């Protein structure tokens, strides 16, 4: 079955229009993409609005787009930006749904087998299903993803074939529909009505699809669908009545009965062949282990159509040849999609490195009888397989790597900032007396209420420097990999808010740090060639001072290395162009003042508000959440809502403590809605 995608135009909704270098960059990028160029490079200086440029590019070319980021945090930031810029289009977030993941592994030296252990984030899993649902049902889709998009995923054709399309007036037997939902990996549960489950009450079936927050109610009269509703799963309130709805499977690895029967046959055949090899080599223990594990999985697949670790048999389910690339998220896109790789100097090498790390672990499992050789084909794409599947790519970076620069026919530059801000001036100073000089520079800027970043080469030096500055009366903190993520967010917010003035770090002051209050970046030991002092790293670090009108960078070095020369020459080139543009157009650089948003503060405020509200009603935590289902129209009373609010508040704070920020933010939003509902009920006098 070929997907039928609804067509709606991509549209950017913004109070701002393209400015600075953006109009030229957008026009040139769109021209090259429309001309069919396979690779285009955007060299965009820090703070020039590359994300907005990408959004306007998508609006120009009208293509479904995959945006790749090199970590979950940046992906979440990008997804938020694109949702604000394109509110009428489907902006999806596709990352690994594991909060914790320990893959199965075997250590031959100690004869230790490590079972697969993982903790799945249900909200991120919903967003993954929402992504594939959107890709197969509409064209106006922007997916923000990490390298998770190149890992194996179920075959889109089988996913589509398993989908059930329901329509009012449609003839279908109730039991047939129930069996269909079970085959789609949904579970019947008449008590716990949650995502991935369905429940049956007489001729009414209710299901919460894996990709939805709202439930679907199917009311039947005999073998005919009489009505379809979308409803709130908690309160049972009907959101809207529908004429038709499509329900997609509850797993990306779903397969039809005939496909599964064929797959089991080829798995058994491979098992016999592999057992023969192992026994011939005298590996009797490995042969027995493989026989037991595989036969158990086969029995599970025969009984329920699924087993733990079914992805290791994906080659058989898909009917692929040995060594053939797996299906992944890229296969769910239409043929004419566009890929935008953000911070390409980091993301491109990351994509290329995924395959080897995965295969080395699995080879050990295969050799020792824990998995069949076909498990090796459940893997991420190799770099050449990735490029074969991508029709056109736009690489975005302030410092494009050699690979990107060698691919495109010249780069598209975006150097001029909409704010008129110019790249910081660079001053090279000798290392002798560098600490005293830096201390003097810090005091000058503290008097102006400006902030300072100091980057060192080692953790020890960062700590010692922090202690020295603190003894000298400077308000200072340090930041390195041992500082946990939540504390890192707090430190950056405190720096911007003026709780302290100087932040000392190592390699954490590069991509993705947006600190407009910083006017000085000090780079100690700038002449020590290496990863932390390469031209790319230096340019990225210099960019941290590019969001302030009086931004400066002080490099402490006794020798001018090649990396320093390249970084200084590139920065001077950009400054010259920016100053000339500002002079020609009469632009005065405008200070960039961004609102300081700290998720920890927002969540703490929400939690305090909830506590006061419940105490005000004499509540607090009550008995376990009662069963909210009602015959007819379900509704939650005030007391029940209090309990739910209390539970949700605990879940929100727990999610924040476990660094599940996306989940915490969503719980915060849901909490706000429920509290508004409770206040309205109190105002109206509807108390239970």
UniProtKB/Swiss-Prot annotation:
- Keyword field: ATP-binding, Cytoplasm, DNA damage, DNA excision, DNA repair, Excision nuclease, Helicase, Hydrolase, Nucleotide-binding, SOS response
Indicate where this protein is primarily found: cytoplasm
Any idea where the Helicase C-terminal domain is? 434-587
Cellular component terms per the entry's GO annotation: cytoplasm; excinuclease repair complex
The chain positions of domain UVR read: 642-677
Q: Mind telling me which Pfam families this protein's record contains? A: Helicase_C, ResIII, UVR, UvrB, UvrB_inter
> In this entry, which stretches build a coiled coil?
none
The protein's name is UvrABC system protein B
Q: Which organism is it from?
A: Clavibacter michiganensis subsp. michiganensis (strain NCPPB 382)
Classification of source organism = Bacteria, Bacillati, Actinomycetota, Actinomycetes, Micrococcales
Q: Which gene encodes it?
A: uvrB
């Amino acid at each position: 079955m070929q997907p039928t995608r609804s067509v709606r135009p991509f549209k950017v909704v913004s109070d701002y229009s393209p400015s600075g270098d953006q109009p030229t960059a957008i026009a040139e990028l769109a021209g090259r993409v429309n001309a069919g160029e396979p690779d285009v490079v955007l060299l965009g200086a820090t703070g020039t609005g590359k994300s907005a440029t990408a959004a306007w590019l998508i609006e120009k070319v009208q293509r479904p787009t995959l945006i790749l980021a090199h970590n979950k945090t940046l992906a979440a930031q990008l997804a938020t930006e694109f949702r604000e810029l394109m509110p009428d289009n489907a902006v999806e977030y596709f990352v690994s749904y594991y909060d914790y993941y320990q893959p199965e592994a075997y250590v031959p030296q100690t004869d230790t087998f490590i079972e697969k252990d993982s903790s799945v984030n249900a909200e991120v899993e919903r967003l993954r299903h929402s992504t594939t649902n959107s890709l197969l049902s509409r064209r106006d889709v922007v997916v923000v993803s990490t390298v998770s998009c190149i890992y194996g995923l179920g075959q889109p054709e089988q996913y589509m074939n398993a989908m059930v399309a329901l329509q009012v007036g449609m003839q279908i037997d109730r039991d047939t529909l129930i069996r269909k939902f079970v085959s789609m990996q949904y579970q019947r549960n008449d008590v716990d009505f949650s995502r991935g489950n369905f429940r049956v009450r007489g001729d009414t079936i209710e299901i919460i699809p894996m990709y939805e927050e709202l439930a679907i109610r199917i009311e039947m009269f005999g073998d005919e669908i009489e009505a379809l509703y979308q409803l709130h799963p908690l309160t049972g309130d009907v959101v809207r009545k529908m004429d038709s709805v499509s329900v997609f499977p509850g797993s990306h690895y779903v397969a039809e009965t005939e496909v599964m029967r064929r797959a089991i046959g080829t798995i058994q055949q491979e098992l016999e062949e592999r057992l023969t090899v192992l026994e011939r080599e005298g590996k009797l223990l490995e042969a027995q282990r493989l026989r037991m594990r595989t036969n158990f999985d086969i029995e599970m697949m025969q009984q329920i159509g699924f087993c733990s670790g079914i992805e290791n048999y994906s080659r058989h389910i898909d009917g692929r040849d040995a060594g053939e690339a797996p299906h992944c998220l890229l296969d769910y896109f239409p043929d004419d999609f566009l890929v935008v790789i953000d911070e390409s100097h980091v993301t491109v090498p990351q994509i290329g490195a995924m395959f080897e790390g995965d295969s080395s672990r699995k080879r050990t499992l295969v050799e020792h009888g824990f998995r069949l050789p076909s498990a090796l084909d459940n893997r991420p794409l190799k770099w050449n397989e990735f490029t074969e599947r991508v029709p056109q790519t736009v690489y975005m970076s302030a410092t494009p790597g050699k690979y990107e620069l060698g691919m495109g026919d010249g780069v598209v530059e975006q150097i001029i900032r909409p704010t008129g801000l110019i790249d910081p001036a660079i001053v090279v100073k000798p290392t002798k007396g560098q600490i005293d000089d830096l201390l003097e520079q810090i005091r000058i800027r503290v008097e102006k209420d400006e902030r300072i970043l100091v980057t060192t080469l080692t953790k020890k030096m960062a700590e010692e420097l922090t202690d020295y500055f603190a003894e000298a009366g400077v308000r200072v903190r340090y930041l390195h990999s041992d500082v946990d993520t939540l504390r890192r967010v707090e430190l950056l917010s405190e720096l911007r808010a003026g709780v302290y003035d100087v932040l000392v770090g190592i390699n954490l002051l590069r991509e993705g740090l947006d600190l407009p209050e910083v006017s000085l970046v000090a780079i100690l030991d700038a002449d020590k060639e290496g990863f932390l002092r390469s031209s790319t790293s230096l340019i990225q670090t210099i960019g941290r001072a590019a969001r302030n009108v009086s931004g400066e960078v002080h490099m402490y070095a006794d020798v001018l290395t090649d990396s320093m020369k390249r970084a200084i020459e590139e920065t001077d080139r950009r400054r010259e162009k920016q100053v000339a543009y500002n002079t020609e157009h009469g632009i005065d650089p405008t200070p960039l003042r961004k609102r300081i948003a700290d998720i920890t503060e927002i969540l703490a405020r929400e939690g305090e508000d909830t506590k006061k509200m419940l105490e005000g009603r004499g509540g607090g935590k009550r008995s376990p959440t009662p069963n909210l289902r009602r015959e007819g129209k379900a509704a939650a009373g005030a007391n029940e809502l209090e309990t739910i609010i209390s539970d949700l508040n605990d879940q929100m704070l727990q999610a924040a403590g476990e660094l599940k920020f996306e989940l915490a933010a969503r719980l915060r939003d849901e909490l706000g809605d429920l509290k508004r509902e409770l206040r309205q009920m109190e105002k109206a006098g509807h108390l239970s």
